[in-house]
Amino acid sequence: MPEKHLSSQFDSDLNNISSHVMALGGLVESQIRQAIFALSQFSPEAAEDVIVTEHKVNSSEVEIDREIASVIGRRQPTARDLRLLMAMSKTTANLERVGDEAAKIARMVKSILEGSAPRSLPSSDLRVSADLASGLLRKALDAFARLDVPMAVSILREDNEIDKEFDGFVRKLITYMMEDPRTISASLDLLFIAKAIERIGDHSKNIAEFIIYIVKGEDVRHTPLADVESSMS
C-alpha cells in the first residue's frame, strides 16, 4: 500500500500496520453483518454474538495505535509518512466506532425483544440503509487498501444517500408511533438503530477523507462536496 522506502524494515512496519487495519476492518464488517441479521430476524443469539465481539475490536484498536506510536518513535518518519500514520490511526479509531455502532444495534434489538411491542414494527425498512452503510464501509476499506482517491470521493457522495434514507425512516417512524402509541418504546429503539446505521455511513465518509489527506495532503473535512470534487478532478 505505501510507497517503497530506502529502509525495507520501515516498509515492513508500514505494511504490517496496514494489514492490521484491514483485519480490523474485516472484523467490524462481520459485526455489522451479524447486527443486520439480528435485526432482520429478531435473533437474540446473533445480537449477543455482536456484543461479545466488541472487546476484540477495542483491543485491536489499542494494539494498532501502539504499533503506530512505536514506528513514529523509532523511524522519525517524513511529513508524508507521518500523514499516512496519522490517517491510519484515525481510520482505526473510526473502525472502532463502527464496531460500537454495531454493538449498539445489537443492544437495541435485545431491548425490543425484551419488550412487548408487536412484531409488525417497520424494522425491515431499515434494511436498505443498513445495506447501503455496510457496502459503503466495504468500499472505504477497498479505497484505503488502494489509496484510491476517486473512489474516496465517490464515498463522500454516496453517504448523502444514507442520510436521506435516515430522514425518510424517521418521518415514517413518527407516523407509526402516532398511529399506535403502544409501540413508542420499541420505536425509539428502532430510531437509535437507524441513527447507528447513519453513523456507520459517517465513519466511512471520515475514512474516505483520510485517504484524500494521505494522497493529496489536503484536509477536506467540512469542505462542501462540490468543492472536493472540483479540487480532485
Where on the chain are the PLM-derived regions?
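Cytosolic, long alpha-helical scaffolding segments
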Residues: 1-233
